[in-house]
Amino acid sequence: MTITVPSIASRTASRIAIGLLFFSFCCFSQEKKAELCYTCHGKDGTSTTAMTPSLGGQPSFFVVAQLFLFRDGRRGKEPTPMDAVAKDLGNDDLRALGALFEKQPPPAPPLQGADAAKLARGRALVESRNCRVCHNPDYSGREQMPRLANQREDYLLKAMRDYRGNRRIGYGSATMPEELAGLGDADLADIAHYLAHYRKPK
């Protein structure tokens, strides 16, 4: 499986579309705001949108922290579509959305598409980097550390590339570049594949 990053043109088009969708976001109730989040992130907690993370089962603390950073324009070194989405969210909105997504069911492992060789390499890399120390032994996340298990593969790969390239700031930016140092794109792809297809041992 090859993961590709969208072109500048497609990213720009996505930002315009999101901007139009959320132009009156500040005027909506918390329930309506949550419904608009579902447009990209999935109503059942599982995203079916490319490069867009699933939020079901994410720790509330993590969701609130990320929305806070987006609202302040401090989530990345370049503007993101989420900056515009979050700019009119109040603190009560952040807490409500955090609680909502934490209660949603986490995404399930994909039913197909797993590559045994990539899974083995990814597992070895993840265990050698002690990812479980911060993200929990089952990669379910805790506090400000996100859930990694069964996250979208394309999103995991992009996030790791951004951390490795120091393009992502905020929580994690102090430790993740060091944790990913020395890993090539193929290594990151194997890690993303393993985590996306992770199954908790019985």
Predicted regions and their residues:
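Short, tandemly repeated low-complexity microdomains enriched for cysteine and small residues
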Residues: 77-85, 110-116, 172-179
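N-terminal secretory signal peptides that target proteins for export/translocation
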Residues: 1-12
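C-terminal capping alpha-helices of c-type cytochrome domains
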Residues: 87-109, 154, 180-202
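Bacterial N-terminal signal peptides
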Residues: 15-24
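Gly/Gly-Pro-rich "capping" loops immediately C-terminal to redox-active cysteine motifs
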Residues: 45-74, 83-88, 123, 127, ...
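Residue-level hotspots at or immediately adjacent to binding/recognition sites across diverse folds
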Residues: 43, 81-82, 137, 172-176, ...
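Sequence/structural segment immediately N-terminal to covalent heme-attachment motifs in c-type
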Residues: 28-44, 109-110, 114-137, 152
